[in-house]
Amino acid sequence: MSQQETHGFQTEVKQLLHLMIHSLYSNKEIFLRELVSNAADAADKLRYLALTNDALYEGDGELRVRISADKEKGTVTIEDNGVGMTRDGVIEHLGTIAKSGTAEFFKNLSGEASKDSQLIGQFGVGFYSAFIVAKKVTVRTRAAGHKANEAVLWESEGEGSFTVDTITKASRGTEITLHLRDEEKEFADEWRLRSIITKYSDHISVPVEMWQEGTPERDGPDGEKIPATEGYWKVMNKATALWMRNKSEISDEEYQEFYKHISHDYTDALLWSHNRVEGKQEYTNLLYIPSKAPWDLWNRDRKHGLKLFVQRVFIMDDAEQFMPSYLRFVQGLIDSNDLPLNVSREILQDNHITKAMRTGITKRVLGMLEKLAKDDAEKYQQFWAEFGQVLKEGPAEDFANRERIAGLLRFASTHTGSAAPTVSLDDYLSRMKEGQNKIYYIVADSHEAAANSPHLELLRKKGIEVLLMSERIDEWLINHLTEYKEKQLHSVTRGELELGELEDAAEKEAQEKLAEESAPLIERIKAALGASVADVKVTSRLTDTPACVVTGEGEMSSQMIKLMQAAGQPVPEVKPTFEVNPAHPLVSRLNDLQDEAAFADWSNLLLQQAQLSEKGSLADPSAFIKLMNQMLLANLK
């Protein structure tokens, strides 16, 4: 009995269908790669479920994907005998996009076809790619373990809606028929389909078959009879797990196509590593570094991790237990000989085998990046532009590998004079001055604010390099990366400048003398500013600026306060140390003022200027403007 229903596509599906047809027209053949990839996944899922319920095979354990075409009708059919779908499953998977961050994805689309095609590729179009070439798509499917009369028919022309009906289907699995548009009839040609399968699906471990026509009986060249042959389903791909083959047998093109298969990325991977580990644990891993960051890299709900196989049997996607969060951009798989076939996420969580494999894989990825940085600096900069901020999470997460991760970090620097983050900590160490025992850095809201900070004045004068940090994550990073190769990282905006041997005896003596001579002025400023500052001192770091504010050692920096406030976290009140430069004309004129009210106003103005320079904002900008106008008016009289 028919149970036909009509459903409207989810809004995002309508958008995606429209975008695909208009943005992916230059690479139409990927529809076959996507549909074959889905069919192979369905076979993998059935193989996994059958581990605990062999009856799901229904006496047919030879899993495969079959592709056929009808030139006259203008159709292409992709059929598998995998896990299949129920009616509810069809409505869920073929009518909606069940992905977190979908709305954010659509916001990122620009309307420019070339850029959008990359984003859509990262999003993973899967089944919907059929509509790139088809005016209508028909799906017949039956879930493994369900009765023949519980099969489902799904049809749509890819516009606003789709129909679902109950049908009878003897065999389990899914059959997708594409009714090609008139201008896409080339894809009904068998040789065209074969070339696409060879190009995109050679690496898939499930056999991909096409019908090979038989030949009638015929006469041979010497008059002998050549017997007729029957038609048969011919395997068109190598149908072996690519990662189990020898590296020497696998071409770069095959590695890249396999990457696209597991990642659903349209762009090539930046680099990869394929290894077989033997010893206490035996496993194979194939790891890829993408060339582009996924659009949802910063989405907290985004799943990440490797595909897990046990003895060539697919177990799960997104096995995050094998990869730390700061390497969540890594794609690939791991195939273990030691884990049980019935392994679950819970078992993986506290498993000593898992922990040993995670340690090994993490070291492997860090090694890949170290080699890339050493061998191809330009390519490493490409990686850094995409994933550098994520890697900066590493020192906080992975104490054991903190030094290795630190060596992979890149920063802007006063040495290069550029905003590009190209300087490694090893580069910095190689240029340190004789007697220098600290790595100096500054964290600010922007590169310009860091590069032009008054806190750098003395260091610039002495030719001491300073690392310039301006990304949101930098303050978090620096709280967990306090030294590198026994050299302490020292903020130029926190506590004493501590130049050590870089400051000679004459300079120290002159500084002490200036502080002594300026003691009365310092006391007056302290009295004028009162509780708004923690302390007032003569500066040792300024040469051209009248004053600056400094965070005390152990106090929360202004950047960290901003991060905490942005996250809605309570922050303690932090009072700055106010450093003044008595050699600056403004400060020396201040010292001459006898009117204490005017002295207090000028002191407050200098303090707020320094805070504005340091933080980029003030707690009460209106009060600052009012005071400034008052001072201007007084001096215009």
Swiss-Prot record:
Protein name stated in the entry: Chaperone protein HtpG
Keyword Chaperone: yes
Record region (B): 346-562
Subunit-structure text: Homodimer.
Organism of derivation: Shewanella sp. (strain ANA-3)
Keyword terms, alphabetized: ATP-binding, Chaperone, Cytoplasm, Nucleotide-binding, Stress response
Compartmental location: Cytoplasm
Superkingdom field: Bacteria
Region of interest called A, as start-end residue ranges on this chain: 1-345
Function: Molecular chaperone. Has ATPase activity.
A single cellular component GO annotation: cytoplasm
Recorded family membership: Belongs to the heat shock protein 90 family.
GO molecular function terms attached to this record: ATP binding; ATP hydrolysis activity; ATP-dependent protein folding chaperone; unfolded protein binding
InterPro entries: HATPase_C_sf, Heat_shock_protein_90_CS, HSP90_C, Hsp90_fam, Hsp90_N, Ribosomal_Su5_D2-typ_SF
Record Pfam families: HATPase_c_3 (PF13589), HSP90 (PF00183)
Tagged with keyword Nucleotide-binding: yes
Chief place where the protein resides: cytoplasm
